[in-house]
Amino acid sequence: MKETLYAHVRRGAPRRRDWRLWAAVSLVLAVTLVVLIPLLWSVHYQLRYRHFVQGLSESTLAAYRAECLIAERDGELSPVSGGCGYQIYRLAAGLTPGRWGKPPEEPAPVVLDYGDGSTLSFWEVPLRNKASATGLFLWYTDPEGKSDGFSSALLHLDGIQRLLDQDAARAAAP
């Protein structure tokens, strides 16, 4: 018999794979996914809201400086003071967004035009939660035409209408 390089190598029994290692790896992977998915969703949600507020802030500041904020209600246009525009901004920026989504099909009862191509529209919409039957849906369109909006149970259309009415009364007073 001719000796070869592999003549002295002896193969033992095949190794059995350790199931505990695979179980541990699977458990670590599952826990990582359970932690990461909600975390990433939360970060995305926060960044989306930050973008909304930042765009609205820039539009409010530009309209305040140029004194060009216009409200459209029931087809009528009326000027809005910078102070009222800032109050509406503070209300919108202070809201906790409920559900992000698309605006209702019907025309908005109140639309604020900031004069730079951006608008903020308001609708009273039914909500899915049981804490409040209706809430306010805000839809912001920035000067580039990008739009985003959400509903919130913390504010209603009557509150926005009241602010605009008070502002109009102040402007009309001698």
What positions do the PLM features span?
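Function-determining sites in protein domains
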Residues: 2-174
